[in-house]
């Protein structure tokens, strides 16, 4: 019984130590992000989302470092700066409808949902175990305006569109006409385009005449898999 009590005390001390580290890292992260991200609403949205809830237990001590983290199944949760950059480029309005391709554990979707309280976020994921994990995490955090869909042969989720904004959270070899067709006129899509090793983050604005492109900078994402993307390994 004494051993059990000692274990409980030790675990409590370790948890308190971790909480202090997360608090310190979180403060440092947002101080850093304020130097490069102009949108206060984006930063406030990210501050409301507990990133540590979206990573495996072993990765929690690094939850507020400005780095991507492994979430299993060969996938990652994006670097906070990249999440902020993508979200800022979308210029979201409260009632917007948003699509994310590549849910992962649901972190980017949660950030998006914070900015569209009167709208909705649809996020699709090909890896079934990740899709279910994202559902569980988002349900636990009471995100009622997010729908997690299992991805199928169709890229995106056209039956729930059109969308005011689209985020592709994985690297694509080229711009997808299927996704552009799901974007409303005046809507924006942010997608990493390139090869498997290096990409350029591209912001696509759909206009009445076609599309215009703006380059946001170099990036590195895990490759998109499935139709109109890299060959699948599943």
Kindly give the residue locations of the regions a language model identified:
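Conserved nucleotide-cofactor-binding alpha/beta core module
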Residues: 91-212
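Class I SAM-dependent transferase core
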Residues: 2-99, 107-111, 115, 130-141, ...
């Amino acid at each position: 019984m004494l051993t059990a009590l000692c274990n409980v005390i030790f675990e409590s001390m370790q948890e308190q130590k971790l909480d202090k580290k997360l608090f310190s890292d979180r403060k440092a992260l947002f101080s850093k992000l304020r130097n490069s991200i102009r949108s206060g609403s984006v930063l406030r949205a990210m501050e409301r989302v507990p990133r540590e809830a979206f990573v495996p237990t072993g990765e929690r001590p690094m939850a507020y470092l400005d780095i991507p983290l492994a979430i299993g199944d060969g996938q990652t949760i994006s670097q906070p700066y990249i999440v902020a950059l993508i979200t800022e480029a979308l210029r979201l309005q409260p009632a917007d409808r948003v699509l994310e391709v590549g849910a992962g554990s649901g972190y980017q979707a949660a950030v998006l949902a914070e900015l569209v309280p009167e709208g909705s976020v649809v996020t699709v994921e090909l890896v079934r175990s990740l899709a279910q994990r994202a559902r569980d995490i988002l349900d636990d955090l009471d995100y009622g305006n997010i729908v997690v869909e299992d991805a199928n042969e169709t890229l995106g989720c056209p039956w729930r569109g059109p969308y005011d904004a689209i985020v592709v959270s994985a690297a694509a070899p080229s711009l997808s006409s299927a996704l552009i067709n799901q974007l409303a006129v005046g809507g924006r899509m942010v997608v990493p385009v390139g090869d498997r090793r290096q990409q350029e983050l591209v912001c696509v604005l759909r206009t009445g005449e076609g599309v215009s492109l703006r380059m946001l900078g170099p990036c590195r994402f895990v490759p998109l898999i499935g139709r109109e993307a890299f060959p699948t390994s599943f």
